[in-house]
């Protein structure tokens, strides 16, 4: 079997660190320019972190910290 050419990605958020909906700079790293969430295979997050991220982004949108859609896009 040939060696794997793919590197194992490290999660950009350390396991156990809370994902806060008020930290918009962190949340914007995981959102496209059109306002959609990036998938796990692109972000390198665990399933639990992706779930927490999704809930945080939704909460930030509801309290108007993040837009639902990008007005230019």
UniProtKB/Swiss-Prot annotation:
Disulphide bonds in the chain: none
Subunit structure: Part of the 30S ribosomal subunit. Forms a tight heterodimer with protein bS6.
InterPro entries: Ribosomal_bS18, Ribosomal_bS18_CS, Ribosomal_bS18_sf
Keywords: Ribonucleoprotein, Ribosomal protein, RNA-binding, rRNA-binding
Pfam families the record matches: Ribosomal_S18 (PF01084)
Chain segments annotated as transmembrane: none
Gene3D superfamilies named among the record's database cross-references: Ribosomal protein S18 (4.10.640.10)
GO biological process: translation
Annotated PROSITE patterns: RIBOSOMAL_S18 (PS00057)
GO molecular function: small ribosomal subunit rRNA binding; structural constituent of ribosome
SUPFAM superfamilies the UniProt entry points to: Ribosomal protein S18 (SSF46911)
Protein name: Small ribosomal subunit protein bS18
Family named by the database record: Belongs to the bacterial ribosomal protein bS18 family.
PANTHER family found in the cross-reference section: 30S RIBOSOMAL PROTEIN S18 (PTHR13479), SMALL RIBOSOMAL SUBUNIT PROTEIN BS18M (PTHR13479:SF40)
